[in-house]
Amino acid sequence: CERMPKRLKETMIRSDFHMHTAFSTDSEEAVESMLNRAVERGLYSVCITDHMDADYPPDDEMGESAFRLDTENYFPFLLKKKKEYEERIQVRIGIELGLQKHLGTRYETLIEKYPFDFVIGSMHLVCGEDPYTGKVFEELGDAQVYRRMFCETLECIRKIKCFDVLGHLDYVVRYGKHQAEAYSYEKFSDEIDMILRELISSGKGLELNMAGIKYGLGFAHPHPSVLRRYKELGGEIITVGSDAHKAEHIGYEFEIAGELLKSCGFRYYTEFENRKAVFRRIP
C-alpha cells in the first residue's frame, strides 16, 4: 500500500463510484486489477461503472459497436467478483449511460432489466460529436461549444430519468482549445443553474469527478464554483469518482476530495446501493 501523510490518509474519501474496466471500449484493465488496487489504496467500497453509449457515432478506429456494454456477461462476472472480494472491499455494480435525448425509452428498458446499484448519466457528445476528437471545436469556438453542451445536457436530463447522478458536468472543458480560459460558472450561470435545479427537483445528484485534475485543468469536475452553487440551491446528493480507466488511477486525488467538498459546504458524500442513496460523513 502506498504511503501517504497521516493527515491526508485520515481525511481521504474511501468510496470510488466511477471507474472503467475492459468491459468498456476505452479501457483494457482487468476487473481484478482495479479491485486489487482499490484494496491497496485503502478504499472500503467501489462501484464499477462501465460505459453504455447507445448510438455513439461510429468511426474507423472503434467501429459501430463502440461503448456498447455486454450486459449479459457483465452482470454475472461482476456478481462473481463481488462475492470473491466481499471480505476485502464492498463491490457495487453500476453503469455509465451516455445521454442523448432520444435514448430515454431504450435506457429505461435496460435499467429495468438488471439490478444495478448505481447509474451515472453523462454527456459525451455535443452537436453529435465527442469533444474528445476536437472536431467540434474546429467548427465552433470554445464558448459556443460549452454553451451548446450545457443546453443539450438540460434537454437530456429533462427527458431521461433512469439515472442517479449526472457525471462530470463540465467534462467538455477538458477538450476545448483554451480550456478553462473560456470557462467559468459566471459565464454560463443561467444554463448551469437550470441544470442544477432540474437535478435537485428530480431527486438526482451530482458527481465530483476527480479526473479533471488528471487532465491538467487544475480543478475537478465540476468546478468548485458549480459545486458551491449546487449546495446553495439545496443539492445534497454528491458522489465521488476517479473515472479511472487504469488501476493506477483508482482513488485519484481522493486525499483532497473531502476537503474540497467541505470547502463547498458539504458535510456528507453519497454512495449508492440498490439505487438508494447512502450518506457518509466526510472525514
Question: Where do the language-model regions lie?
Answer:
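An N-terminally biased module of ancient metal coordination in phosphate/nucleic-acid-related enzymes
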Residues: 5-97, 101, 105, 110-113, ...
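Surface-exposed cleft-lining segments at the edges of enzyme active sites
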Residues: 132-145, 173-184
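Non-cysteine beta-strand/loop elements that form the S-adenosyl-L-methionine
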Residues: 46-51, 116-126, 164-171, 207
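Charged catalytic cores and adjacent phosphate/nucleic-acid-binding surfaces used
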Residues: 5-21, 31, 42, 127, ...
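Active-site rim beta-loop-alpha module in soluble metabolic enzymes
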Residues: 168-177, 203
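Histidine/acidic residue-rich metal-binding segments in metalloenzymes
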Residues: 70-84, 90-92, 109-115, 142-165, ...
